[in-house]
Amino acid sequence: MTTRLYLSPTPPRNDREGASKSTSASIKHDAYLPPADGNRVLVDRFGRIARDLRVSLTDRCNLRCTYCMPAEGLEWLPTEQTLNDAEVLRLIRIAVVKLGIRQIRFTGGEPLLRKNLEDIIAGTAALRTDEGEKVHIALTTNGLGLDKRIAGLKEAGLDRVNISLDTIDAERYVSLTRRDRLSGVLASIDAAVAAGLHPVKINAVVMPGVNEVDIVPLAEYCISKGSQLRFIEQMPLGPREQWKRGDMVTAEEILARLEEKFTLSPAKEPRGAAPAALWNVVDKSNPDITGQIGIIASVTHPFCGDCDRSRLTTDGTIRNCLFSRTETPLRDALRDGASDDELAQLWAGAMWEKKPGHGIDDEGFLQPDRPMSAIGG
């Protein structure tokens, strides 16, 4: 029997609770009038509060994954247009101290290509949230070179790591990434597990006719390593005209393949604002082999109604959604002498304009102008 895994997509809180336009107006009023201590939260018109900040540290990458970047011809941002270390840390401090951010995820491009990454993580780890806790710090990486730096990154304050791996077949890895580097990624997964950054999460984008055959082998591999595999529906973020809604491999199709090998049951822990729906898996041929797998169904079962993310690009702009067509620049204001409160106000305004959903299925949907490598995962 095939397990039915999802209910209908969750609407934004505003719609879910039947909030009126007047309620939204009061939310906006509160968002722009800080309390006595001068702090705000990043709230939008639908009552969603951003607690998770994705910080892209570079648009550069040492792979050329087919669904993310062209093989050649992509120009990198000039250094002077990107935030320097002090600017990155200042904006992170504003986000944490003044705007209620509690989790920071460093992304790219490939964040391990950022010089002084350990210093940026250490500076972030020194901050305390509005609850008096250490900021939770995570890293999303392709894994190349991570094994050689994992000890220093953990010492600096890194709590957790996500490693991208779409196949464990060597030939298919070369075809997907246009680089022969699989052994380096596998070494980094081993190093992250050994360093105790649990759970080490493995991100795999599933593409039609490309790596569907890797679904079960990836699951077996990740379970053997004690890491948590998360399958991701391919989204319209790569080279234009490559993605077609009708051709994508859906969450249901991924789970159907998993059920050929495993018994699946919903994880009991609450999902909250997490993007992945978690499933406990048991090997049908050996019940002693167990693990947990996540499915991120951003297209077929969007979780926009519970999204708690804000995004800072490497050139200092705020994106309130991965698929937003508009951005709010902070870099120039920062370099022109804006105060922390003024930058926080700009940031709050950007998040207020967040739409109820990503709109992938809307008529007239346009994918972002930036490639994924320049937005940050």
UniProtKB/Swiss-Prot annotation:
Q: Which residues bind S-adenosyl-L-methionine?
A: Y67, G109, S164, M235
Q: Which organism is it from?
A: Corynebacterium glutamicum (strain ATCC 13032 / DSM 20300 / JCM 1318 / BCRC 11384 / CCUG 27702 / LMG 3730 / NBRC 12168 / NCIMB 10025 / NRRL B-2784 / 534)
Per the UniProt record, the lineage of the source organism begins with: Bacteria, Bacillati, Actinomycetota, Actinomycetes, Mycobacteriales
Q: Which SUPFAM superfamilies match?
A: Radical SAM enzymes (SSF102114)
Keywords for this entry?
4Fe-4S, GTP-binding, Iron, Iron-sulfur, Lyase, Metal-binding, Molybdenum cofactor biosynthesis, Nucleotide-binding, S-adenosyl-L-methionine
Q: Which protein is depicted? A: GTP 3',8-cyclase
Q: In which pathway does it act?
A: Cofactor biosynthesis; molybdopterin biosynthesis
Q: Where does [4Fe-4S] cluster 2 bind?
A: C304, C307, C321
One Pfam family name is: Fer4_12
Residue sites binding [4Fe-4S] cluster 1 per the record: C61, C65, C68
